[in-house]
A protein has these predicted regions:
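Mid-domain Rossmann-like dinucleotide-binding core that forms the NAD(H)/NADP(H) cofactor-binding site
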Residues: 80, 118-194
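Short, glycine/polar-rich helix-capping loops at beta-to-alpha or helix-loop-helix junctions
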Residues: 93-96, 171-179, 244-249
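Short glycine-centered segments of the SAM/dcSAM-binding site in methyltransferase folds
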Residues: 84, 142, 166, 232-233, ...
Length: 324
């Protein structure tokens, strides 16, 4: 097998394409031949030693991928060689093969495209857990999605629309805003040229959004939280802007609002039955055409460094997917 190996986490340029022994699955594991792998923001951080999870060196980056089961480890009974799966394993995806825990594999239904499957689990599970479980989003409520043109943002737009919410999508360019509108966003804000607070006031008749979905953090956090509706729910999804914001807690008191943390990975570990039911619903919505990953582009796995560079420009709309 071949894979991109990180021997020194000082950045993308240190990654090396290497031939490695094909691993043998141990008990509870499966060997997967990888067909497609997507880039997520943690994949950029992990090779810079900036991510909260720091795998032992050397490691193969790539947290989310799809492929075909090749071999089963002892005790694996729910999968068979030849079956198509999507996997979320933290590392291992940017290679031709990977050994992963069997419980990290989701069996793909017929008609689920490999490229879509590689760009599905992390973003859609995060957004569903955030909006449906943590925020208890209701039909008719208004959701503000920050970073709306990114992977989790585009998933959040589609999931919010699937349950009948009104969506305001905020993004950094007119082109990205147009793409969000094409996904069903009812209104858009270009926060590079428009004032967020004034725009939200105008778009909500002064009420503010009921739910704020924030994977960005940074300087946008406080202005949008000041705009939140009474009994609003502010979802802390991530910090793509870099700095972790500090919110004045008196604002939560004055608005009767909730600041809600969203950590889908630990939710899946702690509440596996609920997570499994969520994945079934997401797969059904995909089959019904209610949700579909937005793929910015597909690139050969050999061009991973160029894909990382593109992702680093923040010009990506949806997800980048590497194909073998």
């Amino acid at each position: 097998m071949h894979a991109w190996l990180c021997e020194n986490p000082v950045g993308v340029d240190a990654l090396v394409w290497k031939e490695l022994p094909t691993p043998v699955p141990r008990a509870g594991e499966v060997l997967v031949e990888i067909k497609a792998a997507s880039l997520n923001f943690p994949d950029l951080l992990i090779v810079q030693n900036k991510y909260q999870m720091k795998p032992p060196l050397p490691f193969v980056p790539g947290s989310e991928f799809s492929g075909i089961v090749q071999e089963l480890g002892e005790g694996v009974t729910h999968l068979k060689p030849g079956q198509r799966v999507a996997c979320l394993s933290g590392t291992g995806g940017f290679g031709t093969h990977a050994v992963v825990p069997a419980q990290a594999c989701v069996l793909l239904p017929d008609g689920f495209a490999m490229v879509d499957a590689a760009a599905f689990i992390m973003t859609y599970a995060t957004s569903h857990h955030a909006l449906i479980d943590r925020a208890a989003l209701r039909t008719g409520e208004t959701v503000l999605v920050l970073g709306a043109a990114g992977g989790v943002g585009t998933a959040a737009i589609q999931i919010a629309k699937a349950v009948g919410a009104r969506v305001i999508a905020a993004a950094s360019t007119d082109d990205k805003c147009a793409m969000c509108a094409s996904l069903g966003a009812d209104a858009t804000i270009n926060y590079s040229t428009q004032n967020l607070r004034e725009s939200l006031k105008a778009l909500t008749g002064g009420k503010g959004p009921d739910v704020i979905y924030d994977p960005v953090g940074g300087d946008f956090a406080e202005p949008v939280f000041r705009s939140i509706a009474w009994r609003g729910r502010y979802l802390v999804v991530g910090f793509a802007a870099g700095p972790i914001p500090s919110l004045p807690l008196n604002l939560a008191l004055l608005k009767g609002a909730s600041i809600v943390g969203v950590f889908w990975g630990d939710y899946a570990r702690r509440e596996p039955a609920s997570n499994a039911a969520m994945m079934v619903e997401l797969a059904r919505w995909y089959g019904e055409g209610k949700i579909k990953p937005v793929i910015d582009s597909t690139m050969p796995l050999a061009e991973l460094k160029a894909a990382y560079a593109h992702m680093g420009t923040r010009g990506v709309k949806g997800k980048l997917v590497m194909v073998s």
